[in-house]
Amino acid sequence: MSDVRLRFAPSPTGYLHVGGARTALFNWLLSRKEKGTFILRIEDTDVARSTQESVDAILQGMAWLGLGWDEGPFYQSERFPVYKEFVEKLVAEGKAYRCYCTSEALEAKRELAMKEGRKPKYDGTCRNGVEEPGDKPYVIRFKAPHEGVTVFDDLIKGRIAFNNDELDDLIIQRSDGTPTYNFVVVIDDATMGITTVIRGDDHINNTPRQILLYEALGYPVPRFAHVPMILGADKTRLSKRHGATSVMAYRDMGFLPEAMVNYLVRLGWSHGDQEIFSREELIEKFSIEAVGKSAGVFNPDKLLWLNHHYIKESASERLAELLIPFMKERGIVPESGPSLSLVVKTLQERSRTLVEMADGAIFYYRGDFAYDEQAAAKHLVPDAAPLLEALADKLEALADFSQASIEALFKEFIAEKGIKLGQVGPAVRVSLCGGTASPGIYEVIEALGKEETLRRLRRAVAFIG
């Protein structure tokens, strides 16, 4: 194992968003490629908004995508003593100070700066020490350098520089004694030995402040890679109005995890013109430097196309297992009907999602369906009844009820009767499926099995009268 250490650090204030999932995936892929360590950290310092339900949703989403972690999950809420120790260290070394300025005074200074056309930032009233009564509330600020430039080479964006005189003296501990995000993230990354930080580009402006904290604490500064955000089709930030944004919502909509992984990694990263990647190929070929600088646009049609590909390529036995909850949602107990694996085989080519597959499978398990009125009027006609009855008799005598034998029987049957398949096929399809849209009739007959096929054909004959 190498010294490369990466982390995914979500806040448990909601579900695992597709943007967060992509960030987790990039970190996971790089850790696997470099034979490093992938750490999961839950940033739950916002106790009021953090929920166990959200933690569970994040862990569930990670597990569904197959993004296992090597260390963790670590919870920031359990590390407050660690943060307090580092705050006290900075204060003792003169690198942080107590600030007694009230929120009203700070707001007045902010408004004045805006009025005078200056960038609003803390003016350093308490920076060099002030005598205040011990019972007055205070925050603790980091004493940031006001001269020079903070520069870092972003692995995606390139060189980025900030003038230090534009940076505030960052609050690192609130008046209630709790640490702030920008402080705890540095302490965690430093003490956990994180070597590369891959995160959303909405964190770029936090980076110079965090670099200055690393330097003040005497820790090595990790490499940074800021990933562009994901946009909706209208080029605004992806949100619920664009459709589902939760990873687990896509699972519930019948998407396969490998399709989601393949789609997410291609939202910003590419390897030539290749579209389909196995997990092994992704680990081998992924590089953070190949992630584009511009935002990716979420395209549900592309995700559907990928999902259809993976459904067609997947083993029917695995899909059958995944399909069971979708069937039960529709009130169907698959054990009470034909082999679900055989049913799946008939639907793989035509199903883009497991939801579509489950809907397409219903007729196999409900033999009492009503016939589509138009289809019945057109195909379940008096001339069809003797053909269906004769076909049922032939099928009843068939010993080998495989698709190949069924197809051979049909060819023999239409030759005997001197008819074309089109003169009996649609009537058979409506008899077995209730309508004219279904998988191939030979596949359907094999999946239904002899007993159910005969029952449905004779039911149709009785319907015709």
Curated annotation (Swiss-Prot):
Amino-acid positions noted as binding ATP in the UniProt annotation, renumbered to this chain: K240
Keyword Flavoprotein annotated: no
Placement of sequence motif 'HIGH' region: 10-20
Entry's Gene Ontology molecular function annotations: ATP binding; glutamate-tRNA ligase activity; tRNA binding; zinc ion binding
Pfam families named in the record: Anticodon_2, tRNA-synt_1c
The entry's keywords: Aminoacyl-tRNA synthetase, ATP-binding, Cytoplasm, Ligase, Nucleotide-binding, Protein biosynthesis
Enzymatic class: ligase
Main location: cytoplasm
UniProt catalytic activity: tRNA(Glu) + L-glutamate + ATP = L-glutamyl-tRNA(Glu) + AMP + diphosphate
CDD domains, A to Z: GluRS_core
SUPFAM superfamilies: An anticodon-binding domain of class I aminoacyl-tRNA synthetases (SSF48163), Nucleotidylyl transferase (SSF52374)
InterPro entries: aa-tRNA-synth_I_cd-bd (IPR045462), aa-tRNA-synth_I_codon-bd_sub2 (IPR020751), aa-tRNA-synth_I_CS (IPR001412), aa_tRNA-synth_I_cd-bd_sf (IPR008925), Glu-tRNA-ligase_bac/mito (IPR004527), Glu-tRNA-synth_I_codon-bd_sub1 (IPR020752), Glu/Gln-tRNA-synth (IPR000924), Glu/Gln-tRNA-synth_Ib_cat-dom (IPR020058)
Subcellular location: Cytoplasm
Enzyme Commission code(s) on record: 6.1.1.17
Protein family: Belongs to the class-I aminoacyl-tRNA synthetase family. Glutamate--tRNA ligase type 1 subfamily.
Function description: Catalyzes the attachment of glutamate to tRNA(Glu) in a two-step reaction: glutamate is first activated by ATP to form Glu-AMP and then transferred to the acceptor end of tRNA(Glu).
Subunit and interaction comment: Monomer.
Protein's recorded name: Glutamate--tRNA ligase
Species of origin: Geobacter metallireducens (strain ATCC 53774 / DSM 7210 / GS-15)
Lineage, top ranks: Bacteria, Pseudomonadati, Thermodesulfobacteriota, Desulfuromonadia, Geobacterales
